[in-house]
């Protein structure tokens, strides 16, 4: 009974929304999408177009996947093609170009292997001898990812990787980030009309930490590189990390010059959203399908909006009468800002 009620409410009272995934098994994505039927998956471009034209998006949603991890893209693309679901993959182009990996990927592998002692690095001294020192450092790293240029944390991250290899007897390959999808694979997958590749910036750096010149470069260069390799115009961006802190005050205005939309990790539906601050609903492997339905209904409800504004859909998170705890994802993206 509860299952049928949630499905009815999702179809009838949820505004259009964008799902955000990172690294996740395809069977979990399939379970989530099946759980929110009869809501219908549509291309991101269609959802953005309908929102921009003030047309109803009720009962519609788009699927997006961040970061361009090779095995993840391949597995999910197979699922989307098999099920006939259009989907958008956001690519950080430097990761695809170099396969060097992003700081949060290195950190995820390094954290459990760090020696619990005082460590002297070229970039500074870190004391990990306390019982909660590693967890405290992890919190500081996440703040840096969301607010600072990568030069303030990436060199230290690589130094820690060298230390773990040297002192813990771990092979570098064992702690290296997963390989990205390759550009030839991107080109091949992009020939299928269901699969689209868009921009996740160049370096996966918080855009609030970039100079005006670097901000424009990240947006223009990543757009042009994705267009070159796919043969399709790159018209959509996902902000790295996606929190308001990491996006900053200038990025949306710049994004409007280069893209039709730019997605955040703020929660809500797309009905009245700024196209260059578009909300998404992040879902993670550990979430239940019941949690996913409740989160979407709570954060994308149009019930209160219909009372006050019959023309435009508006996100009314608080009015839905529920509280959905924000999740922390595998990429270090988290909560309303992921």
Place the predicted regions along the sequence by residue.
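C-terminal active-site subregion of NodB/CE4 polysaccharide deacetylases
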Residues: 1-64, 70-71, 192, 202-205, ...
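Metal-dependent polysaccharide deacetylase catalytic core of the NodB/CE4 family, i.e.
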Residues: 19-22, 59, 81-245, 272, ...
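Short acidic, Gly/Ser-rich segments with clustered Asp/Glu that frequently serve as metal-coordination loops
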Residues: 67-74, 79
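Glycine-rich, phosphate-binding/catalytic loops in enzymes
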Residues: 79-82, 254-255
């Amino acid at each position: 009974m509860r299952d049928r009620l949630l499905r009815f409410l999702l179809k009838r009272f949820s505004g259009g929304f964008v799902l955000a995934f990172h690294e996740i098994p395809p069977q979990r994505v399939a379970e989530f999408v099946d759980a929110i039927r009869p809501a219908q998956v549509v291309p991101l471009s269609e959802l953005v177009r309908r929102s921009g034209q003030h047309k109803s998006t009720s009962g519609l949603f788009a699927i997006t996947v961040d970061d361009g991890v090779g095995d993840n893209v391949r597995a999910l693309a197979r699922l989307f093609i098999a099920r006939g679901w259009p989907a958008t993959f956001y690519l950080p182009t430097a990761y695809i170009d170099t396969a060097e990996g992003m700081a949060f990927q290195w950190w995820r592998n390094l954290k459990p292997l760090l020696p619990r002692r005082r460590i002297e690095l070229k970039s500074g001294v870190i004391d990990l001898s306390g019982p909660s020192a590693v967890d405290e450092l992890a919190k500081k790293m996440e703040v840096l990812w969301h607010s600072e240029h990568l030069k303030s944390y990436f060199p230290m991250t690589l130094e820690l990787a060298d230390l773990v290899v040297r002192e813990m007897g771990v092979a570098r390959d064992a702690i290296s980030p997963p390989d990205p999808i390759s550009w030839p694979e991107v080109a091949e997958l992009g020939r299928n009309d269901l699969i689209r590749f868009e921009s996740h910036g160049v370096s996966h750096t918080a855009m609030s930490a970039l100079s005006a010149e670097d901000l424009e470069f990240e947006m223009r260069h990543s757009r042009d590189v994705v267009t070159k390799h796919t043969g399709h115009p790159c018209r959509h961006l996902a902000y790295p990390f996606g929190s308001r802190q990491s996006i900053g005050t200038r990025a949306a205005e710049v994004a409007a010059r280069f893209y039709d939309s730019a997605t955040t990790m703020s929660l809500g539906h797309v009905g009245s959203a700024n196209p260059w601050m578009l909300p998404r609903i992040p879902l993670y492997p550990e979430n239940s399908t019941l949690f996913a339905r409740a989160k979407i209904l709570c954060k994308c409800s149009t019930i209160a909006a219909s009372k006050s504004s019959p023309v435009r859909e508006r996100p009314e998170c608080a009015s839905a009468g529920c509280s959905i705890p924000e999740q922390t994802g595998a990429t270090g993206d988290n909560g309303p800002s992921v």
